[in-house]
């Protein structure tokens, strides 16, 4: 019987052990999609206790606690931090088989040197020992990044953001981790949302352009893209809860924009017309600047209206959508390709039923010039588990080039989430090792070791170009 989470955790064969320990383990991290706060990195945030660093803002953990019958008071409410920690400690033993169970114990091991299982009995001891580590001078946002061997952090940023802290970090000479912005213009595309007009006012202020026409709007977006580029941004990110496409023209998009400025009702066709033209406009600009475009497809968000009104978005009430994506995605990408303006693109799906749709779609638009130009993004969110990661890797390998994969992202608000890169690398090495043991790929450790290192770091660095 294997020991729980020992040094060969998730490594079930000799080749996997060799690949992980000799090739993957010590590779740096290139985190090209996360939700860390650049302000907290710049200010080198320190934490009061383990609840603050671990449970604040972590809706993965919140969902489990709710499922365990924990009252909201102990999740997002006014209970004190120790009470919240104990509530989580009561929950985690019920979560065996869930990646959060593994991440919890990996983080305790890697950042606190604690190898005990977290439960109600050990909660007090772990609370005290973890907080002792947190109280040390070297436990801070920047030092956690250094300890995790992170070389690049790419945050998620609204086009109206000042990027104040990215600029300050860029100017620092003694901090050698790159902290770069990503351009996330969802609020500029979601014309049907209640906050669209108020966001336009923010865009006016940020761009210095008075927006009274669709041309003004596009010019303001373009100006913000150029500003982001000047600060080091080389990647955009779009949350496509559904994949829109409507055969359209600039004139049609202009009409829709005029209607929304006068607060008239929009049809779905009008909404999709506006989104399609605007998205194509943005894609062309990304291609011109050699940016990467990320499309996160398939989340069904804010399902619980009652809790959304109380807590707002990103609080644990999202799930997987099941709408068709193939046709609209094909037409959207093709519209850019026709004009020679399809940027490097990473497609993520939240619905694993669409794995083969995405993995085969990228093959339609590889250009024979940029290796791995079109990417099937890492297993995302609800798929970020052992089975989900393996399925994404196997699907990509079955119909594409695994060796060109740009690898894992944390997609997290937590500074401790870099343990997820270790989790991913162990699963990657185990899968390749399994193929070797079965005689499905050659036992060429140098070839396989290079592929593992490339997926762990090198491919992402080359692909992003920064």
Swiss-Prot record:
MF-aspect GO terms: glucuronate isomerase activity
Protein name: Uronate isomerase
Catalyzed reactions: D-glucuronate = D-fructuronate; aldehydo-D-galacturonate = keto-D-tagaturonate
Record pathway: Carbohydrate metabolism; pentose and glucuronate interconversion
Record family assignment: Belongs to the metallo-dependent hydrolases superfamily. Uronate isomerase family.
Top-level EC class: isomerase
Swiss-Prot/TrEMBL GO biological process terms: D-galacturonate catabolic process; D-glucuronate catabolic process
InterPro entries, alphabetized: Metal_Hydrolase, Uronate_isomerase
EC number: 5.3.1.12
Keywords for this protein: Isomerase
């Amino acid at each position: 019987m294997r020991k729980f989470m020992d040094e060969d955790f998730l490594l079930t064969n000799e080749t996997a052990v060799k690949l992980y320990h000799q090739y993957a383990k010590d590779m740096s991290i290139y985190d090209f999609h996360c939700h860390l706060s650049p302000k907290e990195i710049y200010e080198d945030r320190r934490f009061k206790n383990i609840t603050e660093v671990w449970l604040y803002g972590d809706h993965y953990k919140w969902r489990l606690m709710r499922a365990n019958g924990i009252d909201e008071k102990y999740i997002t409410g006014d209970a004190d931090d120790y009470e919240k920690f104990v509530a989580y400690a009561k929950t985690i033993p019920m979560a065996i088989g869930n990646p959060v169970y593994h991440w919890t114990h990996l983080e305790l091991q890697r950042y606190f040197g604690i190898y005990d299982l977290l439960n109600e009995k050990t909660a007090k001891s772990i609370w005290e020992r973890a907080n002792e580590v947190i109280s040390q001078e070297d436990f801070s946002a920047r030092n956690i990044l250094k300890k995790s061997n992170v070389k690049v952090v790419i945050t998620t940023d609204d086009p109206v953001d000042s990027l104040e802290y990215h600029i300050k970090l860029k100017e620092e000479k003694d901090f050698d981790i790159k902290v770069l912005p990503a351009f996330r213009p969802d609020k500029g595309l979601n014309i049907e949302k209640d906050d669209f007009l108020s966001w336009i006012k923010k865009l006016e202020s940020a761009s210095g352009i008075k927006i009274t026409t669709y041309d003004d709007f596009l010019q303001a977006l373009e100006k913000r893209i150029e500003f982001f580029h000047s600060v080091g941004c080389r990647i955009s990110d779009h949350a496509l809860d559904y994949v829109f496409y409507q055969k359209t023209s600039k004139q049609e998009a202009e009409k829709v924009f005029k209607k929304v400025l006068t607060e008239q009702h929009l049809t779905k066709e009008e909404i999709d017309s506006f989104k399609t033209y605007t998205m194509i406009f943005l894609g062309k600009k990304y291609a011109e600047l050699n940016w990467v475009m990320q499309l996160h497809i398939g989340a069904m968000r804010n399902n619980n209206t009652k809790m959304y009104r109380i807590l707002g978005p990103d609080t644990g009430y999202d799930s997987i959508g099941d709408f068709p994506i193939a046709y609209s995605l094909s037409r959207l990408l093709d519209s850019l390709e026709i004009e020679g303006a399809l940027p490097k693109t990473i497609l993520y799906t939240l619905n694993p039923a669409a794995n083969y749709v995405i993995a085969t779609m990228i093959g339609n638009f590889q250009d024979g010039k940029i290796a791995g130009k079109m990417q099937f993004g890492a297993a995302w969110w609800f798929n970020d588990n052992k089975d989900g990661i393996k399925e994404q890797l196997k699907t990509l390998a079955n119909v594409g080039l695994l060796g060109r994969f740009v690898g894992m992202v944390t997609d997290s608000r937590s500074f401790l989430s870099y343990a997820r890169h270790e989790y991913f690398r162990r699963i990657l090495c185990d899968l390749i090792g399994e193929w070797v043991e079965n005689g499905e790929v050659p036992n060429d450790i140098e070839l396989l070791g290079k592929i593992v290192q490339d997926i762990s770091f090198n491919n992402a660095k080359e692909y992003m170009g920064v």
